[in-house]
Amino acid sequence: MSNAPYDPATEGARMNFKGRMSYGDYLMLDRLLDAQAPLSSAHDELLFIIQHQTSELWMKLAIHEIKAAMAAIAKDDVQPAFKMLARVSRIFEQLNGAWDVLRTMTPSEYTLFRDKLGESSGFQSFQYRSIEFLLGNRNLAMLRPHAHHPELTAELEAILAKPSLYDEALKLLARRGFFIGADGQRTDWRGTRSESPEVAAAWTSVYRDPQRHWELYELAEKLVDFEDYFRRWRFNHVTTVERIIGFKTGTGGTSGVNYLRKMLEIVLFPELWKLRTGL
């Protein structure tokens, strides 16, 4: 047995990348790893930055998958949407795990750099707002934090001009022969829709005969799966913030924990949750 160090080149691995695309080139790691610029000497500021930057990367993928799922549902090509929505659920499972890393930072450690954040706050996240709007939580007041970036406002307005993910699911429900009341005549998508007894009755019919309406049933369960993970993400956000800053005002001027708790009251797909009581 040779004691020489293992050399991957002996098995054909390329070791010289001059003039060729390497792993770092493909992922543009020089730019990615140069994007962390702490404003203080505090040890934990790098953790804070990376936590939020990686969350934004995962949200970028979530938006990609949600939009693709919506397009598939709109074309009655429902099966691929199942995979996409399952992936979004896994993304939020990953994001939930990230809170555990941030929670290793104590209140004392956070105070060492909090003043460097200025008025920046997570509720100003363009991608998070995009996800909320795509899912149907369309609070138009939340356009205002992006008004200083007209191009971002235009992208959010473009999302508001089209049906949400749940709207696309309801349109599919109607195309499959179910009566969905006023939701069937909607043409203005900008606001948050109201809960509907007709929609609840339609989904209840699906759940009472899942074999007959398997695609609709599976789609509904994928939506519930996703909202379940999304709720956990919101809850973990609340508890992490309370653990680190208590009930202080948020850096963006919100009421901090109290603001985040209000978000826990929002239900994205209300009929899919309420129908369970009557089955």
Swiss-Prot record:
Recorded superkingdom: Bacteria
Name recorded for this polypeptide: Tryptophan 2,3-dioxygenase
Keywords annotated in UniProt: Dioxygenase, Heme, Iron, Metal-binding, Oxidoreductase, Tryptophan catabolism
Cofactor note: Binds 1 heme group per subunit.
Catalytic activity: L-tryptophan + O2 = N-formyl-L-kynurenine
Gene symbol of the encoding locus: kynA
Subunit composition and interactions: Homotetramer.
Molecular function, one GO term: metal ion binding
Binding site for substrate: 48-52, 110, 114, 251
Record has Cell inner membrane as a keyword: no
